[in-house]
């Protein structure tokens, strides 16, 4: 081995052994904010697909909360050209006299008055219905 490579190896070993540990926690990192100054708090600990961005324009400024999953999908679709769909232009519904608003079923029952016996329910429940529970939606999941 050459002298410069040995010298470099010894210098590297000495510098890494003599380096002082870095203090990652300091008291300057926590801000002392009085309780009266706090307007609100939003916990985003479990939401990994929420980003908070500062926003300002000529009329408004504030914080913008975005769903990063939807934003990344939209960014991928930016290169897709937007073509118009084939659709009829909007117009008022026009019905001729006697024309029905909708078509009936082919095998519909004949019309009759609803007859309920005492104690008879208006409808029957499903045999294997799920137990009642609160609706749970994951972040970014649509309502329907």
Swiss-Prot record:
GO MF terms, alphabetically ordered: mating pheromone activity
GO-annotated biological processes: mating; pheromone-dependent signal transduction involved in conjugation with cellular fusion
Gene Ontology CC terms, in alphabetical order: extracellular region
Keyword Ribosomal protein appears in the UniProt entry: no
InterPro entries named in the record: Mating_factor_a (IPR016326), Mating_factor_alpha_C (IPR006742), Mating_factor_alpha_N (IPR008675)
Listed Pfam families: MF_alpha, MF_alpha_N
Superkingdom classification of source: Eukaryota
UniProt keyword list: Cleavage on pair of basic residues, Pheromone, Repeat, Signal
N-terminal signal peptide: 1-19
Function: The active factor is excreted into the culture medium by haploid cells of the alpha mating type and acts on cells of the opposite mating type (type A). It mediates the conjugation process between the two types by inhibiting the initiation of DNA synthesis in type a cells and synchronizing them with type alpha.
Entry comment, domain topic: The mating factor alpha-1 precursor is identical in S.italicus, S.uvarum and S.cerevisiae, except for the number of tandem repeat units: 5, 3 and 4 respectively.
The protein's name in its UniProt record: Mating factor alpha
Source organism (scientific name): Saccharomyces uvarum (Yeast)
Phylogenetic classification of the source organism: Eukaryota, Fungi, Dikarya, Ascomycota, Saccharomycotina
């Amino acid at each position: 081995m050459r002298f410069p490579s040995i010298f470099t190896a010894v210098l590297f070993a000495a510098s890494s052994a003599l380096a002082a540990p870095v203090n990652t926690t300091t008291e300057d990192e926590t801000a002392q904010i009085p309780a009266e100054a706090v307007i609100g708090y939003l916990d985003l600990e479990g939401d990994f697909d929420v980003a908070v961005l500062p926003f300002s324009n000529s009329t408004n400024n504030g914080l913008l909360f975005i769903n990063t999953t939807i934003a990344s999908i939209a960014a991928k679709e930016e290169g897709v050209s937007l073509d118009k769909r084939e659709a009829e232009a909007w117009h008022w519904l026009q019905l001729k006299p006697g024309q029905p608003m909708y078509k009936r079923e082919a095998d519909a029952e004949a019309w009759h008055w609803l007859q309920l016996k005492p104690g008879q329910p208006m409808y029957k429940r499903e045999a294997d219905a799920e137990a009642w529970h609160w609706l749970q939606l994951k972040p970014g999941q649509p309502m329907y």
